[in-house]
């Protein structure tokens, strides 16, 4: 049609006009310019409308790009010569690689193995010279085995905390927003004891170091100490739900609903409704509680911005620890010394020292830029802190001015836990992932998560259990389930 032909003609004219006024820059190096003797303006293009300063800058940039390509080309030639030398050496030993000659842009398939070996050797040499820099976003080359063993399903709401008993028999404890705490058989996944003494969300659970006593903290502004008696059922063969995964080799799963719960699985197990002791001094939610070494005192952390130290036998308040500017999020005690660390939304964590009975000292640490979700002790002289600022930091108690290692991740971190023997940190994330790092900040593995296994909602807490032969790591989340894992980290991965 006339309209179409006219429009096409107009478009062609406009295109030719733009082309005639386009910048024409001929890139050349200094040697070519010296050989031709042409003036700079002729090399740049007579019809350029750009100012001379802009043209000069462009020429300089193009020159830099050209030099980079020249360097790459030279390196490529050197690599090819190395490969030729390697092939000649192999041929002299009777191990010549067929088709190892190089084409202009590629190598033959069978020569790629030699190239890979050479490339790996170069990478190893480079890494050895730069090993002082730790990047938490780089995975290691060895394989860590992370196997899902058991799922513990029975809570009616999200699970905030998970813990393992320190006395025989070894059982798993979970604290849930459904106002209950449950004890589980690790081997069978059966509920053994249900604690229903709280009238609010149960936010944490910790076990006495030598007796069958549990300590729970709740949104009802109290902490309870209660006794449990468990009788383990006969273990059944564990179904093989394993998926041996290393690093990042798992398949991401889509958002799915929480696991279906047929009936109340905790209705058949014995229920404890009355605590031995109820600690009631807080004016807000009690978010966490823990036993001091020896088990004669406990510490609680609350949204009223205080942490309280209680005597277990008398239930009396011994100390009220004040100083945080916002709500507390967690508390943890040292396994062998009278030390307490408290975490807060004020971006700090505080170290409280009760080793001297006459006075207690406090140190404030400001290493994070967002809520400190947890800070925990290791057996040695380290504290590990995790935060909503997506970092985990490792501190030395002898010099806590700055962290000795920093782990940067892609999601907020919740209640962390450190494996005593292997010194591995388990990081539960808001984004449903669980990652494992060593104390130097090197990532060891990420727990598998697919359409068939793993957490489907935020992971709230992690807990190691080195003494159990089947599961040595437990995680829980807001998908209303706890998961038992078997983690096998090769010794090679832990070598420094």
From Swiss-Prot:
InterPro entries (alphabetical): G-protein_beta_WD-40_rep, WD40/YVTN_repeat-like_dom_sf, WD40_repeat_CS, WD40_repeat_dom_sf, WD40_rpt
One GO term (biological process): corpus callosum development
SMART domains: WD40
Region (Disordered): 1-50, 238-267
Nucleus found in the keyword field: yes
Lineage top rank: taxon: Eukaryota
UniProt biased composition (Polar residues): 1-13, 22-31
Location within or outside the cell: Cytoplasm; Nucleus
Biased composition (Acidic residues): 247-265
Keywords (A to Z) from UniProt: Cytoplasm, Nucleus, Repeat, WD repeat
Pfam families to which the protein is assigned, alphabetical: WD40 (PF00400)
Effects seen without this gene: Mice lacking WDR37 have reduced absolute numbers of circulating T and B lymphocytes.
SUPFAM superfamilies tied to this protein: WD40 repeat-like (SSF50978)
GO cellular component: cytoplasm; nucleus
UniProt key word ATP-binding: no
WD repeats: 154-194, 197-236, 281-320, 323-362, 367-405, 408-447, 454-495
Compositional bias ranges of the Basic and acidic residues kind: 32-47
Subunit organization: Forms homodimers. Interacts with PACS1. Interacts with PACS2.
Physiological role: Required for normal ER Ca2+ handling in lymphocytes. Together with PACS1, it plays an essential role in stabilizing peripheral lymphocyte populations.
Protein name listed in UniProt: WD repeat-containing protein 37
Protein's organism: Mus musculus (Mouse)
Gene: Wdr37
């Amino acid at each position: 049609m006339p309209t179409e032909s006219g429009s096409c003609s107009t478009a062609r004219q406009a295109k030719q006009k733009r082309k005639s006024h386009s910048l024409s820059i001929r890139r050349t190096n200094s040697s070519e310019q010296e050989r031709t003797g042409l003036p700079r303006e002729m090399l740049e293009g007579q019809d350029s409308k750009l100012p001379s300063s802009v043209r000069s800058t462009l020429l300089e940039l193009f020159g830099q790009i050209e030099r980079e390509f020249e360097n790459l080309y030279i390196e490529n030639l050197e690599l090819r010569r190395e490969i030729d030398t390697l092939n000649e050496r192999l041929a002299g030993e009777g191990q010549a690689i067929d088709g190892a000659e190089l084409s202009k842009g590629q190598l033959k398939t069978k020569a790629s193995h030699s190239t890979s070996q050479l490339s790996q050797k170069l990478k190893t040499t480079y890494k050895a010279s730069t090993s002082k820099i730790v990047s938490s976003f780089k995975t290691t080359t060895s394989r860590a085995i992370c196997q899902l063993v058991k799922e513990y399903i029975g809570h009616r709401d999200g699970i905030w905390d998970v813990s393992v008993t320190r006395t025989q028999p070894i059982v798993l404890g979970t604290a849930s927003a459904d106002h209950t705490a449950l004890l589980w058989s690790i081997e069978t996944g059966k509920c053994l004891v249900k604690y229903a003494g709280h009238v609010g969300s149960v936010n944490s659970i910790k076990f006495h170091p030598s007796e069958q006593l549990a300590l729970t903290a709740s949104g009802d502004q109290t902490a309870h100490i209660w006794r449990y008696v468990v009788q383990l059922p006969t273990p059944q063969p564990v179904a093989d739900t394993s998926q041996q995964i290393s690093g990042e080799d798992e398949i991401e799963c889509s958002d799915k609903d929480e696991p279906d719960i047929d009936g109340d699985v905790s209705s058949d197990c014995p229920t404890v409704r009355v605590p031995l002791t109820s600690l009631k001094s807080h004016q807000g939610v009690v978010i966490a509680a823990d036993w001091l070494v020896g088990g004669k005192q406990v510490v609680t952390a609350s949204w009223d911005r205080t942490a309280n130290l209680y005597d277990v036998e008398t239930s009396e308040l011994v100390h009220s620890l004040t100083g945080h500017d916002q709500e507390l999020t967690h508390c943890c005690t040292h396994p062998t010394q009278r030390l307490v660390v408290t975490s807060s939304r004020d971006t700090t964590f505080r170290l409280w020292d009760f080793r001297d009975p006459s006075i207690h000292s406090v140190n404030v640490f400001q290493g994070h830029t967002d809520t400190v979700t947890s800070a925990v002790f290791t057996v040695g002289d380290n504290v590990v802190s995790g935060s909503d600022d997506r970092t985990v930091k490792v501190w030395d108690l002898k010099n806590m001015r700055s962290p000795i290692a920093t782990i940067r991740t892609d999601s907020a971190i919740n209640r962390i836990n450190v494996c005593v023997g292997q010194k591995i940190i388990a990081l539960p994330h808001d984004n449903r992932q669980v990652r494992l790092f060593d104390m130097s900040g090197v990532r060891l593995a990420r727990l598998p998560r697919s359409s068939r296994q793993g957490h489907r909602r935020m992971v709230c807490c992690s807990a190691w259990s080195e003494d159990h032969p089947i599961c040595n790591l437990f995680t829980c989340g807001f998908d209303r389930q706890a998961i038992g894992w078997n983690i096998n980290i090769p010794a090679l991965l832990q070598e420094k």
